[in-house]
């Protein structure tokens, strides 16, 4: 089976993580999974949501959006429609859950970190790229908090990354781009820690049910791919 991109079944797209991409945010990253490009910023603010006031712990949340021409044809801005779409809400909740799993919220004090993920070009895997890049932006925000004496102890538990896998033309493949994603029999997104701990699995049989053996094949590919992505994260954080 030849993938449209010519990649091997277990091969990630070209990955790059560029830190300090914008000027103002406490953490900012441009993350590229092939032709999918996302700007991720992390903003540190005093205070927490109402349900956490007085609890002595912090909060991490996320917002997600796509530029109108991040895709082949222009999409209307959700702000112009006056409401977010269901897909947007689902993805930003996933990003928030994934990043909260990366930190010990009790060590943040009553501070909030808001992650903004803005897709500037989409070619499949925007949510997985967002999570992977946002984790690096989050680490930079935590480092800022330590330098500024806002917190005393590093709250980072582990790096978190995400990748897509799927069944394409009867074979398990890693890191689907748009041509594969739109024609896959199964599409799955996995979020894991750098130690291989599972945070979330989202999987859907698009064309036909998938077997337990196929699931194991996809899981194995995802675990290996996320291990590679975490190495990209570590390398970027030492630059």
From Swiss-Prot:
HAMAP family found in the cross-reference section: RNase_PH (MF_00564)
Superkingdom as given in the UniProt entry: Bacteria
EC number: 2.7.7.56
Binding positions for phosphate per the UniProt entry: 87, 125-127
Function of the molecule: Phosphorolytic 3'-5' exoribonuclease that plays an important role in tRNA 3'-end maturation. Removes nucleotide residues following the 3'-CCA terminus of tRNAs; can also add nucleotides to the ends of RNA molecules by using nucleoside diphosphates as substrates, but this may not be physiologically important. Probably plays a role in initiation of 16S rRNA degradation (leading to ribosome degradation) during starvation.
Gene: rph
Protein name as it appears in the record: Ribonuclease PH
GO biological process, one term: tRNA processing
Alphabetical keyword list: Nucleotidyltransferase, RNA-binding, rRNA processing, Transferase, tRNA processing, tRNA-binding
InterPro entries associated with the record: ExoRNase_PH_dom1 (IPR001247), ExoRNase_PH_dom2 (IPR015847), ExoRNase_PH_dom2_sf (IPR036345), PNPase/RNase_PH_dom_sf (IPR027408), Ribosomal_Su5_D2-typ_SF (IPR020568), RNase_PH (IPR050080), RNase_PH_bac-type (IPR002381), RNase_PH_CS (IPR018336)
Transmembrane segments: none
Summary of subunit composition and partner proteins: Homohexameric ring arranged as a trimer of dimers.
GO MF: 3'-5'-RNA exonuclease activity; tRNA binding; tRNA nucleotidyltransferase activity
Top EC class for this record: transferase
Record-stated family: Belongs to the RNase PH family.
Stored CDD domains: RNase_PH_bact
Catalytic activity: tRNA(n+1) + phosphate = tRNA(n) + a ribonucleoside 5'-diphosphate
Pfam families named among the record's database cross-references: RNase_PH, RNase_PH_C
Organism from which the protein derives: Teredinibacter turnerae (strain ATCC 39867 / T7901)
Keyword tRNA-binding: yes
